[in-house]
Each structure stands twice: as structure tokens, then as C-alpha cells.
Amino acid sequence: MAALRNATPFSYRQDPAVPAFPDDKPIFIFDGYCVLCSGGATWLMRHDKKRIFRMSTAQSSLGAALYAHYGIDWDATYLLISNGLPYTKSGGYLHMCAVVGGWWKAVLILYLIPRALRDWGYEIIARNRYRWFGKVEYCQMIPDDLKVTLLDTAAEDAAQPQRSAGGMSFSDAENAAISARS
């Protein structure tokens, strides 16, 4: 795996292209159009009983800016930022399970598998996720009781025409970019 650019703690705070956001908790940034990814985010919201995580989509202005800051393609992986550090692919999911705690810590046994092999498996799923699990035109609806974990980026994107669903907003340009990648 190529090293992430700017992978020092809280480096995004000095990047004027990254909108300010509360970073006192980990933030999970996912593909809002991917059924598997949105399902994973909903799973995290339901199992995060202590409300440790915040969420945003890769298609939001915050998500896009953070992906650009770290030099990664949102279509290749999700992004988890915890204690100001970026995590992606299998290592990020294992870190997330450790933070969620409970019996999910049992998943940490996967650290025994070399990262290259874990990430290879992750990349196969990531490349085929739309074909295997589907894709939605608009971000899926998030139940009201779980919306508290979402970072609201609508104000940042107010200058662009919006399509909104489940508390997450996407501009026509963002929707076109998603459609072009499928």
C-alpha cells in the first residue's frame, strides 16, 4: 500500500482546503452511494452505543477535501480519522472494531494476517462492491435516531444545488461524478 500523504496527526487542520469540523472524536467517511458502505456506516451507528464516532460521506465537501488532503481516491477505500491520524482499508476496520469494543474486539485476531493480504481481500471487495451489493442514486436514508452521528455539511455546500437524503447532501456535480465512475 502506498503511504498516505500528510499522514501526521491533525495535519488537515493546516490545510485551507479542508473545512473546519469537530475532530474530538473519530470520523468515518464512506461512499454514500454504495449499498455495502452505507450499510456498514449504519451498522457502525447502531453498534456505537457510546456515540464515539462521527460520520460523513466521501461525496460531501468535507469528505472530498479530506480524501484530497491525504492523496487517496474515495472510490478505492473509506477513510477513518482517529486521534488526527488516517486509517484506510483493512487496518481501519480493525481499528474501528477495537474502538467500538465489546465482542467486536475479537475481530482483532485478523491482525495475525499480514496487512498486504488483508488489504488485497479488501481491494477485491471494494472494486466489485457496486456490482455485488448495488448502488443507489441518492444517499440512503438514515434512521432519525442515528442521525446524531452525522456531520452536517449542507451549510458548506449551500452554494451548489442540493439533493438531500438522510441528513447528507450532494450537489448535482457530485452525483454526476458518482454516475461517471459506475
Model-assigned labels for residue ranges:
Residues 16-47:
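Local sequence-structure signature of Cys/Sec-based thiol-disulfide redox active-site neighborhoods
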Residues 24-25, 51, 76:
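Short coil/turn segments at beta-strand junctions that form active-site/ligand-binding loops
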Residues 30, 56, 111:
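Active-site-adjacent beta-strand anchor residues
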Residues 46-50, 150-152:
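Short cysteine/histidine-rich zinc-coordinating motifs and their immediately flanking basic loops
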Residues 61-182:
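Thiol/selenol-based redox catalytic cores and closely related redox-interacting motifs
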